[in-house]
């Protein structure tokens, strides 16, 4: 396929490619105004075309069947990763639980969204497989308890691999208050596997930590990082 730089004031990037229903291929794209950084809305299939290279190395224009804004038309698969290391004990974990529960309340389960809950401390634990049951997920969140060390990179790596096996749009959202101190994986391992599967990683940081590593992971995988104090809505 051939990528052509847009002629207007738009910043276009391909986030994910889903070929699970080949020959139908879905592209998930970020399209933002170059000046304001805001998402450009009200775009339909007439705004897009794709050139595919044929057996003779010539590019042939392909039909774009439809173009829809993700949060309106397409199911989303999310692996939600919760830090339950010792430093999260007390108010940090309670704050994270509140934001995670708020997020569950905003998920469009009736549209096909699925959420998986993964926790980590000294090790990585699958708390709940991909589910559309908001009550069960909220209960699992409320039952989280703290452990000891911080295996952040191992948890992110595991979450990326698991959500990558799902079809459609996918991402990882992690909540953490500290730097990794116990993983076998490295930051680079997380970035590489996320980019291999085109899975963006979003990180919500709790408290004052060294933002450099989490910023690298988020920005290098097409995600973003936020401080929990700035997060009022996850929808």
Task: Name every feature range the model reports, one short phrase each.
Residues 76, 82, 89-104, 109-204, ...:
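Exposed acidic/Ser/Thr-rich ligand/metal-binding surfaces
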Residues 1, 36, 199-200:
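Composition-driven recognition of long, C-terminal low-complexity regions enriched in serine/threonine
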Residues 14, 19-79, 84-93:
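Acidic, polar low-complexity linker/tail segments
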Residues 1-10, 16-25, 219, 226-235:
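C-terminal "exit" segments of structured domains
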Residues 9, 60-63, 172:
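Small/flexible residues
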